Amino acid sequence: MTSLYDFSVLNQDSQETSLDAYRGKVLLVVNTATGCGLTPQYQGLQELYDRYQEQGFEILDFPCNQFMGQAPGSAEEINSFCSLHYQTTFPRFAKIKVNGKEADPLYVWLKDQKSGPLGKRIEWNFAKFLIGRDGQVFERFSSKTDPQQIEEAIQKLL
């Protein structure tokens, strides 16, 4: 695979969706959880989305239950939680695994492009990959990086 656009993932209805639909946009790919101490980052993510979506920015939300089971529940329950507590409107996909033998191919590729605090492994919920309009990883941000701290990098790519 040569770019993010070469991948397909499952949407929340378990239908295969090509990421080529996001060609030409600046993307932030995030593994998320609804029961984590970092869950309030959803607010900052939504603020970035509101500010830059019209300029070609999208956030791709991938719930992940690999870190202490902090993303329990069905897709519907996760959507309800995010809508009720954080009014999120960015695209959310089916739950995936980001580490180990069952890691989604998208995340295998992302981790191969940029290492993080633990090398290639995703360290926790809310690790972020910023993707340029060319479908390539521009930067990787740790779970602890507040969404507002990456705003300048987003602006550069827009």
What do the predicted segments below correspond to?
Residues 1-158:
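Chalcogenol-based redox active-site neighborhoods
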